[in-house]
Amino acid sequence: MPVELFILAGFLGSGKTTLLLDLLKSDSQGETGVIVNEAGEIGVDGVVVKDGADDIPLTLLSNGCVCCSLRSSLVLTVGAMLDAPRPPGARPLRRIVLETSGLSRPGPIVASLADPELARRGIRVTVVSTYDCVRGALNVDEFDEAAAQLGAAQRVMLTKLDLVAPEAARAHIEVIRGVNPLAQIVADTDRAAAVRQAFADSGPAGPAEGGAASLAESTVQGLFGGAPAKAHPRIHVMAGALRAGASWDDVAMWLDDLASICGDKLLRVKAVLKVADCAEPIHIQSVGATFGAPRRLVGLAAHEDICVVIARDIDAGDIQAALPDAPIALSNTKHSAVAQRSSKVFA
């Protein structure tokens, strides 16, 4: 049975522990395990979580950050949690939530979880980031870590919605879209409903469910739905155009080169591409420089190619200069410009 592993990211004070406690209170079946990472020697959040739900499997990784010094410990911890005996009558663990420190970057954590043993166990990783509707925009502007957490997220949970007016919340959604147009934004004022959305099962191919058409449609809606977003000065959203006749090997080599050039500046990649040597479009996605297995979208109607790259402090010009003969040509873009080009993708 697949196990969902949620990387719960978010800047300092953005409400990660509160969100985690809300999830644990709603888990009447006791199917959730928790790993809490804190950079200091004293694990305050771990104590708070244990006090809020003292019957859950909980491991504290302290005095180090899982995005750097504790990466090998994390893989061992996940394996040990899955192998640990369950109480009599208890169900198997269905999900594990890793609450990261407020200064962690999700990309290296996802890379450390790309472990063959964890893959064999059917671990499915989703990055959920909390976004503080009081200080979120300031944090993203001032701290690289906050921008990286937002840029790598597959889902962004708005917190402290009760402290801001609806128009302010809409402005924060625009900030999020400017950094990461791929993310599903959870902004439900019904807290229980929001928690369910944030920690919903990812499904066999990632957060989108319902087959190939639904998967591709969700990509388009995430990229092009809604009003044009406010661009972040250091986060670049790039659109890619696939060269006619390019093969899968061409694209795979380009992805390797892209990851090498960008390093930890690469935040997200998501694409649906029709290469010359495959009958079906191929779905590609990454968090940071760690790519999931490509997936053929069987049964998807003919469509234009979609390719979006999100990076920090490196833009399309930099990448094109390094890879002038690449099978995918990148250009800096705003949502409105890409939307116009892609308006007939799923007609």
Give the residues covered by each predicted segment:
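A short, charged/proline- and glycine-enriched loop
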Residues: 1-4, 233, 303-304
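Nucleotide-state-sensitive switch-loop elements of NTP-binding domains
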Residues: 2-14, 18-139
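Conserved catalytic-core segment of NTP-binding enzymes
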Residues: 109-182
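C-terminal accessory "lid"/substrate-recognition subdomains
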Residues: 148, 152-155, 161-301, 312-347
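Flexible loop/N-cap segments at domain edges
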Residues: 309
